């Protein structure tokens, strides 16, 4: 099995950048409100640890996505990669969030922000693999 290391690293970076946009200018204020986070409480966070760990977790996700694409004998191209990424994002991640958020009585807005982020991340990662791998 040959891993596509350039695509893996680029996909992880892209996921990280999507997060910066998603939880920053796009939905940052709504997410903080839904989570009950204030600017004061956010100021005490160890952002180096959070960002570093987030990037490592994005690397793991990208690596596993590459492994998944290679495990099944199917053509790798943009369309196929996006279909698989959508199945993962919507079919596994968003549904898992939905169940957890229902039982923990989280706001619907938080579900849409967080699930939408992961669907978008997997679609972006899938596009990168479809174009580069």
Locate predicted features.
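Juxtamembrane/disordered regions of integral membrane proteins
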Residues: 1-133
């Amino acid at each position: 099995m040959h891993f596509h290391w350039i695509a893996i690293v680029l996909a992880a970076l892209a996921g990280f950048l999507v997060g910066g946009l998603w939880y920053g200018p796009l939905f940052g204020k709504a997410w903080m409100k839904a989570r009950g986070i204030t600017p004061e409480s956010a100021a005490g966070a160890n952002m180096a640890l959070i960002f570093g760990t987030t990037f490592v977790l994005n690397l793991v996700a990208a690596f596993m996505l590459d492994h998944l694409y290679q495990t099944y004998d199917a053509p790798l191209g943009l369309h196929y990669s996006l279909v698989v990424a959508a199945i993962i994002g919507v079919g596994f991640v968003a549904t898992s969030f939905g169940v957890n958020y229902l039982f923990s009585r989280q706001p619907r807005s938080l579900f849409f922000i967080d699930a939408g982020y992961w669907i978008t991340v997997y679609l972006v990662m899938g596009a990168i693999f479809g174009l580069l791998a």
